Amino acid sequence: MAGHDVQYGKHRTRRSFSRIKEVLDLPNLIEIQTDSFKAFLDHGLKEVFEDVLPISNFTDTMELEFVGYEIKEPKYTLEEARIHDASYSAPIFVTFRLINKETGEIKTQEVFFGDFPIMTEMGTFIINGGERIIVSQLVRSPGVYFNDKVDKNGKVGYGSTVIPNRGAWLELESDSKDITYTRIDRTRKIPFTTLVRALGFSGDDEIFDIFGDSELVRNTVEKDIHKNPMDSRTDEALKEIYERLRPGEPKTAESSRSLLVARFFDPRRYDLAAVGRYKINKKLNVKTRLLNQTIAEPLVDPETGEILVEAGTIMTRSVIESIESHLDGDLNKIVYIPNDAAVVTEPVVLQKFKVIAPTDPDRVVTIIGNANPDDKVRTVTPADILAEMSYFLNLAEGLGRVDDIDHLGNRRIRAVGELLANQVRLGLSRMERNVRERMSVQDNEVLTPQQIINIRPVTAAVKEFFGSSQLSQFMDQHNPLSELSHKRRLSALGPGGLTRDRAGYEVRDVHYTHYGRMCPIETPEGPNIGLINNLSSYGHLNKYGFVQTPYRKVDRETGVVTNEIVWLTADEEDEYTVAQANSRLNEDGTFAEKIVMGRHQGVNQEYPANIVDYMDVSPKQVVAVATACIPFLENDDSNRALMGANMQRQAVPLINPQAPYVGTGMEYQAAHDSGAAVIAQYDGKVTYADADKVEVRREDGSLDVYHIQKFRRSNSGTAYNQRTLVKVGDVVEKGDFIADGPSMENGEMALGQNPIVAYMTWEGYNFEDAVIMSERLVKDDVYTSVHLEEYESETRDTKLGPEEITREIPNVGEDALKDLDEMGIIRIGAEVKEGDILVGKVTPKGEKDLSAEERLLHAIFGDKSREVRDTSLRVPHGADGVVRDVKIFTRVNGDELQSGVNMLVRVYIAQKRKIKVGDKMAGRHGNKGVVSRIVPVEDMPYLPDGTPVDIMLNPLGVPSRMNIGQVMELHLGMAARTLGIHIATPVFDGASSEDLWSTVKEAGMDSDAKTILYDGRTGEPFDNRVSVGVMYMIKLHHMVDDKLHARSVGPYSTVTQQPLGGKAQFGGQRFGEMEVWALEAYGASNVLQEILTYKSDDINGRLKAYEAITKGKPIPKPGVPESFRVLVKELQSLGLDMRVLDEDDQEVELRDLDEGMDEDVIHVDDLEKAREKAAQEAKAAFEAEEAEKATKAEATEEAAEQE
């Protein structure tokens, strides 16, 4: 027998084919969320308060200090927050101290600082009743970056930028004439020596002394001449900088000094953050810059005078390690004193070394280090600026190297805690202005912290972040895997990140540093590809937000691969050679081969075993959780694997799911950590268990009660249902499953089912990836899922009186009310169809809502009582089902409702959806298709033992897609079904072909793993042998019920009067430009005319056509489309006198905006007016006629007389 048995939890054993022993268990998969939020509550929030406070008033007589804060118990429990549409948050109280410096009086007071959303154990937040996730953001790390660029003449120039966490950028660049310039905050450039002079080193000789002699320095000094002898060089430099930063303002040296201090050296305006300081010290440190260079002068210990390194020595890693303590100490430290006019007058400490230029052995190059300022220094220092300039000048001499901004050593992750801290900081800095003004305006004697603090800006900032930030997302709750993936997602988008349009190919591409940190496979298809990534399975954040991955340390002396685990970030890993996890080892832990496959700085090749420093801990450390759930991933093309990983996240939870026969061993861990299952918090013994709760008695006698969720609606409208797994008397340990969540079986993730699949064509029904399915899957509810939809109705106060929820609905028969209770609300358990009333509701009717007849009746009988119209909540199209639950919220019961709302009723309708033609199915290898035909069981092909096949797939879907993993899974699945076992074949360490064939043989299958199939309709065998086996197939969330849609009479767009589009708007089908071309090509003029008029936006035409159809008359000619009129009016509004003429050059009258709206409807008053008007018109016409007759008579008389 190939493989060995492995136990997953207490309920499942799998035969595993892995050969590599795992030395490290997977970490908790949602720790990126939970650890970050915990760190925020423990110290992040405190740091933010300490950053902004203390606040002094303008005269510096009063000061507000921060003392501490306390988070109290949440107002609602998790469940209550969900039900009441509230947020799961806890009140936070902050203690402040207000000090009056004149009198010495101190007032300490605790101030309520708003409700702060609290993370649940599952790593989510509940905001306004909806479960949300804060996605971690991938951003460029603060620090100093060097880049190279080639100009049009092929000359290489360099550039450098200091990027802070917040504050002004400082850039260096060289031009084609080899002059070096600096830019401050993206303004115009100035020679870099100008900035050096402003820092207090004004003489040319001083500049050469600091940087050494080089062509770039010489050219720049020549360019930077002393223009105004009245000013000192430093003052002149300061004025020149001020002119660049504030053009047009009067420039003085003093204002320039204060401006530069504010821009770079004031911790409130400029912040590198801990990570920026770490990155700058790492980049500008002399240790890394001296590596492999030849030293040009002896290095002497300043205390003892002992020569540590002779001149001419090559500084290898071992040499540098031997003098590391001296390099970190005072070796070659030089103190420069700036002149008195400088921006910062403190002495500048630099570390200075001379090395032989790599390009020219006769030249000596100066290297300047920043002497490692302390971690507490969060602004840039003059030493940093000078060291950056030195590094920049060294690049031209062939020392140092440029940075790759897509390297994960230069990109870091802002997780929840940091994103929240930034929001609070934003709110506090807005509050600070407010506080300062109130301190200055009000009387000092009576002020208390409570009076001067307005918490509105802080709570608003936090609320806005959770409610509407791009990174605060509605949780993807299709199934446990999609929840887990969402929590581990890394987005490069969002505030302070990239935008889709600007992100180029390089940012999106897979980088060699992604190995073990970010998954190279799981990313969306489409515009976000490569911008949204997933953390790899072992990935972990360090304190600076860089992703680390674990490696086993190799002992260089003995060559033994130890079990000591070292976590490395991407830039640390660059210094070492790492062997792959599948390198063969001897019993004693040494490498079995002299040459092993390994990686060094992104180069994958064979390395001698004796130079390897580390080894991967596991083959699956490369990929994310969803990708690690694909068996035989190593046999799939990466594009299809990407689809497979993404589609597993869209699986719909089924009624009775099955774990896959062929898994990867990842199913248990994914289900355990997803947060969808109920997990034991402590050891104990089960004392009570039913479908709704489980009670566990701990060793110390205390009782834990676990509540089981039944058929709750998830964010994506599926049923979130948990099933108890334990019985009374069971002993549970901490971390054991107490109940399965949705899409789980026996503590393992179970997204789909294990049907018998045959690769064969059948009557052409599986053309283009379509899926043919047996009716058994419908009858036995194999792919049936439950969906819950929520509908709500609220009563408001209107101008004409309050709306009411009632059974008394006008013009509705008793039959429609049969399932409503005495209040007019549907009973739980009622079966409802489209159009049925869920909540009976009436709204008072205004006078203007009444028809002419009703007004007449009111005028005669004075009956005002039934002036209501029916505004009941009815079942929308396609939402038939069973009423699962009804929730009623009223002000009387103390529920918080929006203003103006008196009562809110929510009705939940459950639907059982069986699989049907048009639903989308998929395997785990990116093999997706739509169900094209459901065939009766008796017509399906059957195996020699009489078992009918469940699903038929097209064999042509395999070769061109290159996802051969599905075929391996098929054969192994059949063997597993025959043997009655479950199998684990971990990614990159799974079953080999030998394992596969030996298992097939063990199961007694034929040697080619194919079989004879018989046609179910005729009983004849098919000509060729067919591959039949068990493949794990899932039903995806794209169901035909949600997509099928037809419009009859529906809404029109206001401006163009064309039908709306889309199912949600009950819209029509767009007949676009190309479709019009098709009709034109066929010469179908009448069809074309009616599509562009009646069926679209000819308002009068469509009314008349409707009337004609209903009355059975011929349809009249169409009129002018509304959108044409809109175009004419638009052109007229631009001042073009545009008119429409007919063939006789007569102007065609276009309908005016106010015409033609309500021509048939007429009110009683208008009727009276119309009658009067008609009478007057008739009278006037009569009089005119009489007058005409009289004139005619006169005319005839006159004519007679003349004769």
Swiss-Prot record:
It comes from Streptococcus pneumoniae (strain ATCC 700669 / Spain 23F-1). GO terms for molecular function: DNA binding; DNA-directed RNA polymerase activity; ribonucleoside binding. One of its GO terms (cellular component) is DNA-directed RNA polymerase complex. GO terms for biological process: DNA-templated transcription. SUPFAM superfamilies: beta and beta-prime subunits of DNA dependent RNA-polymerase (SSF64484). InterPro entries: DNA-dir_RNA_pol_bsu_ext_1_sf, DNA-dir_RNA_pol_bsu_external_1, DNA-dir_RNA_pol_su2, DNA-dir_RNAP_su2_dom, DNA-dir_RNAP_su2_hyb_sf, RNA_pol_bsu_bac, RNA_pol_bsu_CS, RNA_pol_bsu_protrusion. Belongs to the RNA polymerase beta chain family. The keyword Nucleotidyltransferase applies. Residues 1174-1195 have a biased composition (Basic and acidic residues). The keyword Repeat does not apply. DNA-dependent RNA polymerase catalyzes the transcription of DNA into RNA using the four ribonucleoside triphosphates as substrates. Its EC number is 2.7.7.6. Residues 1174-1203 are annotated as: Disordered. PROSITE patterns: RNA_POL_BETA. The RNAP catalytic core consists of 2 alpha, 1 beta, 1 beta' and 1 omega subunit. When a sigma factor is associated with the core the holoenzyme is formed, which can initiate transcription. This is DNA-directed RNA polymerase subunit beta. Keywords: DNA-directed RNA polymerase, Nucleotidyltransferase, Transcription, Transferase. It catalyses: RNA(n) + a ribonucleoside 5'-triphosphate = RNA(n+1) + diphosphate.
